[in-house]
């Protein structure tokens, strides 16, 4: 058995932001995404709001300014190495959609119960207010292997 219980793929269940007793959903209550941890110390996360509109064009680097703005404000992505420390994990960000995160280390506090994972952030600014993120994940079902 792998001594690191984070290894694998996890599917987002909820992404909440807490400020005192106030709870908000920065990407909506129907946000979706995945976080993945590899056995050799790499991680990546992708989270998006539900119901994102398609661009009018099929040019992957195209889109109107309005389309790009909407897409950017409804998506979170970063990747890099990580360090598992039992009660917390440190994400050492090497690539990120939000450029200010590149080169930073982000702490996430861990609560793990079977195939359910809760990652909690220290306070950070979300929509102009200091909030703590709470991201609930469930282990993704193993993909069927082709015969």
Regions found by a protein language model. Name each.
Residues 1-147:
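Lipid interaction determinants
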